[in-house]
């Protein structure tokens, strides 16, 4: 069963660049320590940016996220899963609907809602159990929004905080869609088209403004 969560997929793909990134950042004596090291490399080394052209599958592909040095939650989750698999750690991508109470005016205007469907996270098989890790928001972005960056120790689930440092509502998990061997891109794109029609159709040349 775990072989499927070690294999490369179309979006949780494996390239020489991903293998090199994983080899460079997988530091530690055991799988848990290496997974933690990879988590921080993806969380902080790849900038979070939701202003992408989601009609292009490249927004969801791990190798493309690594090449650009930025991505949104699903793309960053794909990259962490890819790196973990390259290091021999079984990994799968999880998807959930969340309500983000602390978004930017520009993003809220484009999306038309604070509901984020198909938010991406990762589950890693460590010390005999699946553990959740959420590498989406890099430290610099969290500091800007006064949200504690998510830490990960490889033993406890790491999901978004319910409140920020000022005790304002931050992230509210509404529905979990389960976990996947690879990213169900067509399913996500179809839902994005239905819910975020203007945002979905935004082209990259019109999306140069950084999120944070």
Where are each of the predicted segments found?
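Solvent-exposed, flexible loop/coil residues
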Residues: 15-16, 22, 52-58, 64, ...
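Secondary-structure boundary elements
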Residues: 1-68
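Active-site neighborhood of thiol-dependent amide/isopeptide-bond enzymes
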Residues: 51-118
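His-Asp-centered catalytic microenvironments across diverse enzyme cores
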Residues: 2, 6, 10, 98-212
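A cross-family glycoside hydrolase active-site/sugar-binding cleft signature
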Residues: 41, 94, 134
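Short secondary-structure boundary segments
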Residues: 29-40, 71-89, 157-158, 204-210
């Amino acid at each position: 069963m775990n072989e499927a969560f070690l294999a490369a997929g179309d979006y949780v793909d494996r390239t020489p660049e991903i293998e090199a990134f994983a080899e460079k950042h997988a530091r530690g004596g055991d799988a848990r320590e290496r997974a933690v090291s990879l988590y921080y490399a993806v969380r902080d080394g790849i900038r979070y940016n939701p202003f992408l052209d989601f009609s292009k599958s490249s927004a969801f592909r791990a190798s493309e996220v690594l090449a650009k040095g930025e991505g949104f939650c699903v793309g960053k989750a794909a990259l962490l899963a890819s790196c973990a698999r390259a290091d021999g750690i079984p990994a799968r991508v999880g998807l959930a609907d969340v309500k983000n109470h602390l978004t930017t005016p520009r993003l809220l205007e484009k999306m038309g809602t604070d509901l984020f469907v198909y938010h991406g996270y990762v589950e890693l098989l460590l010390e005999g159990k699946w553990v959740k890790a959420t590498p989406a928001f890099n430290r610099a972005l969290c500091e800007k929004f006064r949200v504690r960056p998510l830490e990960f120790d490889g033993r406890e689930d790491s999901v978004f905080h319910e409140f920020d440092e000022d005790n304002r509502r931050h992230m509210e998990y509404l529905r979990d869609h389960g976990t996947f061997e690879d990213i169900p891109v067509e399913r996500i794109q179809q839902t994005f088209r239905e819910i975020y029609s203007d945002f979905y159709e935004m082209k990259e040349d019109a999306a140069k403004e950084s999120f944070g």
